[in-house]
Design a protein with these regions (language model features):
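Exported/periplasmic ABC-transporter solute-binding proteins
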Residues: 1-188
Length: 188
């Protein structure tokens, strides 16, 4: 999401500023509203270019095909996702299976993993985020998030929640891991 919400709009704005006097009839409106929004806008014909931090899903590809729209995936950059916890949490590393179990609700208390005890508060991006889809695919093996996982609109919101909650865990793009009140957990 770091790329979709920040970098790509900045690059687009810089391109527009540099070419504002060029004689062409192309118009741009830049809006960073989530990967699903960009893909849907291309499929629905409301835009020619849609920004997305993930590839179109099978459902989106089928919808595009049924409407005669050919989607082209053109990568411009890559990001990574980090799992974060509050700085006071003694957990240093987790297996991918444990991360899956936390976010799907199979593990509900830190005591199941260590001497640190407290009800886990898990934070996720909302469903329109490409980061949400990537994390669900990579870490949850496409399983559903538990209903108690709180969905946030931005990486900044996840960091803010984990900063103030000693039992919090979340995932964010790498550009958001610099807060002294959180730490990145290594994944085995």
């Amino acid at each position: 999401d770091t790329l979709g919400a920040k970098l790509v709009p900045l690059l687009s704005e810089a391109y527009l500023a540099e070419n504002e006097n060029a004689q062409n009839s192309t118009t741009f409106e830049i809006s960073a509203e989530g990967s699903n929004t960009g893909i849907a806008a291309v499929i629905d014909g409301t835009t020619s270019i849609g920004l997305s931090s993930t590839r179109a899903s099978q459902t989106e590809l089928l919808k595009a095909q049924s409407q005669g729209v050919e989607l082209a995936h053109i990568p411009v950059a890559q990001d990574a996702i980090a799992v974060i916890v509050n700085k006071n949490n003694p957990i240093e590393n987790l297996s991918l299976r444990v991360v899956e179990s936390i976010f799907t609700g199979d593990i509900k208390n830190w005591a199941a993993l260590s001497n640190y005890s407290g009800r886990i508060s898990a934070y996720s991006r909302n469903t329109s985020s490409g980061t949400y889809r990537a994390f669900q695919s990579l870490a949850l093996r496409k399983r559903n998030f538990a209903s108690k996982v709180l969905k946030m609109a931005s990486n900044e919101q996840i960091v803010a929640e984990v900063e103030k909650n000693p039992y919090g865990i979340g995932y964010v793009g790498l550009a958001y891991i610099n807060s002294p009140s959180i730490k990145v957990v290594s994944i085995d």
